Regions:
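Structural motif corresponding to the intra-repeat A-B loop/turn of tetratricopeptide repeats
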Residues: 42, 82-83, 103
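TPR/Sel1-like alpha-solenoid repeat signature
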Residues: 72-75, 92
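Residue at a conserved register position within TPR or TPR-like alpha-solenoid repeats
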Residues: 39, 72, 79-80, 120
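Alpha-solenoid helical repeat architecture
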Residues: 1-4, 17-34, 60-73, 101-113
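Amphipathic alpha-helical segments of tetratricopeptide repeats
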Residues: 10-19, 52-60, 94-105
Length: 123
């Protein structure tokens, strides 16, 4: 099943984290974010927290903050859906907007705000 595939892929990436070169970590991070997005879309949140932590670890190592707004969006959805914690979700939302501001991406920031408002209404 997809769940078994995603879980084993995530486990393998996690186990091999230290062996990847810096340029490979950019690709690994994209894969993790894509898996996280699919997990959210399919409401399969079991390993989402682990994926978020791994992606944050990679971003810190490679100093690539461009994907951080998207990761924080995934994180706030996780906090709302799985943990039912609007306070943590709002903190992630604020961080997502902050990272969008740091990259001077006004369009992304506006999209994040729209998505947040939609998510809070359905919470």
């Amino acid at each position: 099943s997809d769940k078994i595939f995603y879980d084993s892929l995530l486990d393998n990436l996690s186990e091999q984290f230290e062996q990847f070169e810096l340029d490979e970590l950019f690709i690994v991070n994209k894969i993790i974010i894509d898996i996280s997005s699919l997990s959210l879309k399919n409401n399969r949140l079991d390993n989402l927290e682990k994926a978020i932590e791994m992606s944050q670890k990679i971003m810190a190592k490679i100093q690539d903050w461009n994907r951080m707004p998207i990761l924080k969006l995934i994180e706030w959805k996780y906090f709302l859906i799985k943990q039912k914690d609007i306070i943590k979700a709002e903190q992630s939302f604020m961080k997502a907007c902050l990272f969008a501001q740091m990259t001077a991406d006004q369009y992304l920031e506006n999209k994040l705000i729209q998505e947040w408002e939609k998510d809070v209404k359905s919470y």
